[in-house]
Amino acid sequence: MNIESEKEQFLKEFGSYYGYANSPKNIDEIRATEFKRLNDTVYLDHAGATLYSESQMEAVFKDLNSTLYGNPHSQSTCSLATEDIVGKARQQVLSFFNASPREYSCIFTSGATAALKLVGETFPWSSNSSFMYSMENHNSVLGIREYALSKGAAAFAVDIEDTHVGESESPQSNLKLTQHHIQRRNEGGVLKEGMTGNTYNLFAFPSECNFSGRKFDPNLIKIIKEGSERILESSQYSRGCWLVLIDAAKGCATNPPNLSMFKADFVVFSFYKLFGYPTGLGALIVRKDAAKLMKKTYFSGGTVTAAIADVDFFKRREGVEEFFEDGTISFLSITAIQHGFKIINMLTTSSIFRHTTSIAAYVRNKLLALKHENGEFVCTLYGLLSSEMGPTVSFNMKRPDGTWYGYREVEKLATLAGIQLRTGCFCNPGACAKYLGLSHLDLLSNIEAGHVCWDDRDILHGKPTGAVRVSFGYMSTFEDAMKFVNFVESNFVISSFNRCALQPRSISLPIEGIAEAAARHFLTSITVYPIKSCAGFSVDQWPLTSTGLLHDREWILKSTTGEILTQKKVPEMCYISTLIDLNLGKLFVESPRCKEKLQIELKSSSLVTERDEMDIQNHRYEVTSYNNEVDIWFSRAIDRPCTLLRNSDSQSHSCINKNGSPGMCRDVGARLNFVNEAQFLLISEESIKDLNSRLKSNGRRRNGGQAVQVGVMRFRPNLVASSGEPYAEDGWSNINIGGKYFMSLGGCNRCQMININPEAGEVQRFTEPLATLAGYRRAKGKIMFGILLRYENNTKTESDTWIRVGEEIIPNGDRH
């Protein structure tokens, strides 16, 4: 695909929408001057967070360095000046939404979520109230349901369908609402009220769905306020006064609600979604009449005009903003928003909307047109039935046989290609279930299988558990979009051109009768990794146990938040070296950041403090912890607080978790220490040589002759085999090493951890060798290199069995 001709075709179709031709700066100038830090990165997660510009941040820092700001609750000169700037910021926000200051107030919060929480906490719920919300809402909106239900109110979701049947003067005839079942709680202490007082109900919907990009008709505000009885068929849930909440967190950057035309009662958003900075700051735009109904209990500094400490008395401030903003607001962040609005106002939101949606339409059309060589379509896009779409495209992809590509595979390969995107359900469970066709039974089944947010279980029971999302911001370009489309086509469309690249090389098993002529294999290296994700040590011989190599991954480091630390997040762990002396019965640990070498007794140690139980990836472990001296040593070694834990269960653990599922583990039923999938990883020297040859060739093409070369230890194998053909190990169903029998569990799925270079003197992250492996070692969503093994111990009790370097490896033999 030629970029010049492709762009020419794009401009013929979208030229009047794309590029800000009538602005002081066009898109190419904006990218060249304001976003140089992107370099070759393609950033496509603007729905998650858009980017700040260089001139914006220069203005922010210049302002902070030249202006004296004080606490706006003080009465000093600088504080009064700060208060004035905060007031101007409120007006700027209201103007952005075309909201009259006579009708609306701007309450600053820590973000859209905090604004939603404030509405839920203070809304005048009663047992006669209803909370109605569209299915396609963010979790932060769904959380309001807890406040409603706890006060005895009813809660229910609705599907909103845009029918567009014929011409109509009224928008009501084009919108159809389908009600889901009513949710209620019968909790003690909930006051059951009659119909004597006013009943207030709340309806919440997003201006744009963050999952699909579907834009919702703002006429919903008037429809609900004036026609709730018709829509809800005069049920008891339609009675009372309806207030409307718009979650504009996703939509505000390109098409903010116009509050002069559509009178919503509450609008929430975050500033980093608008222009990247500041984070931790959002706002609740509230209609003044609605604010009078809000029942706030807590008061704080700045929210009262008077309070008496030893008497039940306080007097609230009259201003809406003053009473609802607890404590000192983030005034330095608030002063920064004026600099963010500059580029938005220069371009105008209408131009930003046209620019971003033209790019999204291009991507949408290209993805829909992709076909495999057998004629099957590649992409399934979500939200296409909507009349209007925002600058977001969410989709999944299928192989020629109709099975799904996992979204984690897409994300992994995109990262290697320099493309930043988002995968999963995007904290929008209703939209996720709706578009993916997941029933309640499907969702519960996935949960039973151990699936949680942010995990790697992207395909369960033959269905995707989430999707791939790309979203565009005001600084996105056609070139970004085309690079992404090319990435999808080259990595996921099966054609005669790229079929070989998308299938792993496999080796046929030796033909009977000529096995004697096959190359002989020998064990050339044994490596033990006592502490998970830290450096290991090589030995000539080592004892085998029912859990694998003796003491292999018997220890782990845990963060103060309970997270198990690995090189994926703490690459500095590769510099922690380990050594076990079996004769001395000690584990020795060293780090360049620690002067003293740490020594830990293997059998009994004064450093041990207590035993405990903990769950890791749904498996229960008995662990031993160590005293503060040990934890301080490791915390210094990785420059973050952590604790050292040892697996103290003599039986170790089975791979089956408490849900009856193996999770990511493949060594089902085996006894394991803190390994991810299996007891052993075996790598072939010939496979490493072949990979390095490919890396050298790719380096010449991509980097002008500079090539990355990797050693076998980059892959953290326990066992290294010599001789034979590259990837011969792929065909081994079992191996015999010096009379010890091992069962193959298949290939090892590689992750970005192999891109960390531990030999450079400092931690360096590359795209290689994983990017090259992805080009020829992909199989069913995984990038395979090396094989996983399980030791088949013939005896029921632990025996004195050793494995030794130099022993012959005999593949695919009979077990004796």
Curated annotation (Swiss-Prot):
Entry's EC annotation = 2.8.1.9
The catalytic activity, as recorded, is: Mo-molybdopterin + L-cysteine + AH2 = thio-Mo-molybdopterin + L-alanine + A + H2O
Alphabetically ordered keywords of this record: Molybdenum cofactor biosynthesis, Pyridoxal phosphate, Transferase
Q: Per its UniProt entry, which superkingdom is the organism in?
A: Eukaryota
The first-level EC class reads transferase
User: Which tissues show it?
Assistant: Ubiquitously expressed.
InterPro entries given in the database record = Aminotrans_V_dom (IPR000192), MoCF_Sase_C (IPR005302), MoCo_sulfurase (IPR028886), MOCOS_middle (IPR005303), PyrdxlP-dep_Trfase (IPR015424), PyrdxlP-dep_Trfase_major (IPR015421)
Q: Which GO terms describe its biological process?
A: Mo-molybdopterin cofactor biosynthetic process
Location of the MOSC domain: 647-812
Q: What is a GO molecular function of this protein?
A: pyridoxal phosphate binding
N6-(pyridoxal phosphate)lysine: modified positions: K273
Q: In which pathway does it act?
A: Cofactor biosynthesis; molybdopterin biosynthesis
Cofactor (UniProt)? pyridoxal 5'-phosphate
HAMAP family from the xrefs?
Answer: MOCOS
Q: What family is it from?
A: Belongs to the class-V pyridoxal-phosphate-dependent aminotransferase family. MOCOS subfamily.
The name on file for this protein is Molybdenum cofactor sulfurase
Q: Which organism is it from?
A: Solanum lycopersicum (Tomato)
